[in-house]
Curated annotation (Swiss-Prot):
Additional free-text comment from the UniProt record: There are 2 genes for uL18 in S.pombe.
Matches recorded under Gene3D superfamilies: 3.30.420.100
Assembly, per entry: Component of the large ribosomal subunit (LSU). Mature yeast ribosomes consist of a small (40S) and a large (60S) subunit. The 40S small subunit contains 1 molecule of ribosomal RNA (18S rRNA) and 33 different proteins (encoded by 57 genes). The large 60S subunit contains 3 rRNA molecules (25S, 5.8S and 5S rRNA) and 46 different proteins (encoded by 81 genes). Component of a hexameric 5S RNP precursor complex, composed of 5S RNA, rrs1, rpf2, rpl5a/rpl5b, rpl11a/rpl11b and syo1; this complex acts as a precursor for ribosome assembly.
Any GO BP: cytoplasmic translation
Protein species of origin: Schizosaccharomyces pombe (strain 972 / ATCC 24843)
Major site of localization recorded for this protein: cytoplasm
HAMAP family cross-referenced by the UniProt entry: Ribosomal_uL18_A
Gene Ontology terms for molecular function: 5S rRNA binding; structural constituent of ribosome
Cited function: Component of the ribosome, a large ribonucleoprotein complex responsible for the synthesis of proteins in the cell. The small ribosomal subunit (SSU) binds messenger RNAs (mRNAs) and translates the encoded message by selecting cognate aminoacyl-transfer RNA (tRNA) molecules. The large subunit (LSU) contains the ribosomal catalytic site termed the peptidyl transferase center (PTC), which catalyzes the formation of peptide bonds, thereby polymerizing the amino acids delivered by tRNAs into a polypeptide chain.
Membership in a protein family: Belongs to the universal ribosomal protein uL18 family.
Cellular component, GO, one term: cytosol
Key words, A-Z: Cytoplasm, Nucleus, Ribonucleoprotein, Ribosomal protein, RNA-binding, rRNA-binding
Official protein name in the record: Large ribosomal subunit protein uL18B
Record's subcellular location: Cytoplasm; Nucleus
Amino acid sequence: MPFIKAVKSSPYFSRYQTKYRRRREGKTDYYARKRLIAQAKNKYNAPKYRLVVRFSNRFVTCQIVSSRVNGDYVLAHAHSSELPRYGIKWGLANWTAAYATGLLVARRALAKVGLADKYEGVTEPEGEFELTEAIEDGPRPFKVFLDVGLKRTSTGSRVFGAMKGASDGGLFIPHSPNRFPGFDIETEELDDETLRKYIYGGHVAEYMEMLIDDDEERYQKQFSGLIADGIESDQLEDIYAEAYAKIREDPSFQKSGKDAAAFKAESLKYTQRKLTAEERKERFNAKVIEAGRA
């Protein structure tokens, strides 16, 4: 049978419905979002919170967000660019940084709602699978659901590092261990040692040691920040352990100290301002006069 080109007729175009803008741009999965924000119809003024985890090339962003009719509201926010304050100055987008950012947003959110003292979470993580349980004669744990956006949920993904950090920070996040690093799909068991290694940056230390032996030039390039600070692979675990303790001591947000007015002026210096109608007329008249002289 010969190929017949599909002709899009007038009825096709008259019935065509465009998708939502953020769906067309590939930014929002509305199928998942609908199910994440759907609230029980017998609950009133009880927001359904979600842990939103997003990644850029250099940083990790974690937020506790609830949805209302007039938009999303952010309860707590944490960014991995805040981690140097706690001693983590390198690799701000890796698995361990995602864990630390999740821990930070969890402690910050619990402090805001007054549950930080009642739900401390896992103070010394050893890689075991634990869910936050309700305490007797007290308020229930703060419950959130993981929102991964368009991120692929592969086993060992960094998004689950952020979830593990938030869970160890005291939030109740319904989940199972089958997407953590070290989960064996055949035995359906979690290797605690492997997960602990990722929490304390052991996988980074192993990679550093491998590059030292196999490719010195690439090691010098990839870990230049650690080399400049005199940090070796066997020191990473202590650095991350101290950072987690500092996050628990003071999870509050601190401003960077930059002059906002100066920063705005610097950024606007390279932005071309849109001309007003009067300015456009003046420019046009000036060009006409200049052309007449020529």
